[in-house]
Amino acid sequence: MNISEHTDNFIQEMKRRNYSQNTIDNYTSCIKHFFEQSKKDHPKNINETDIKTFLMNFKEVNTQRNYHSAIKKFYDICLGQKNKFRYIPYAKKNNKLPIVLSVEEVQKMFSVCENLKHKVILSLLYSCGLRVSELINLKWEDIDRSRMVINIIQAKGNKDRQVMLTPELIPLLEKYWHQYRTKEYVLNGQNPEKQLKYSDRSILEVIKQLSSKAGVNKRVYTHLMRHCSFTHMVENGTDINLIQKLAGHSSVKTTAIYTHISHNLISKIKSPLSNIRL
């Protein structure tokens, strides 16, 4: 089998094993990108040096680990070579707090956004705190206007959840639908007739372009708007347990990171000295 046939087999086997659609799409995108860059005609022609060189192209540790997992799983499922690249260590996770934008910086990005589709992307990521994979897989039927919620189906960990449908999104989504007439998925790729979904790389590029145009001099990464969304919710006084549910976190400890990266919270703390007459 060639690479394309192996990839199709990879997809079918992941479906058979009941992987979530987000995981299937994520791993498939990673594998396709990897083999495009490798320029090899068969998976067996890939060696450890090829993979190490490819992974070093990514500055983000999480991105490296994501591609590493996808490649490892591909060789396990398709070629039965579970330990083929066992000597390639995973990039070590760092404990640095994620970079977030201020509300003013987010506003600048919206102000310079003239493309309707790009504004929908930015709005959904920021208003709902969606993961990029969740936005890519979002269908029109998932948007429940009667209850003002968006249903996130088979999210990370194969769990469903709901997030709020912000009233400001309604007219924007209506305008978008009338202009693009997308059918199943809210976002379509470059060939709408084939109902191809948007790619995660395309969404990251949109965020990068908007931040650059807005003069935001901070590092842009895939989950930037998600982190901004929840950090700003914390600053607005939203209960951390509610944010945990919106984020789809299994533990509130994961959500607590947003209290650590919120600089505004510190300035809002009332010192007990405030009640003392000096």
For each feature predicted by the language model, list its residue ranges.
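Conserved catalytic core of the tyrosine transesterase superfamily
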Residues: M1-L278
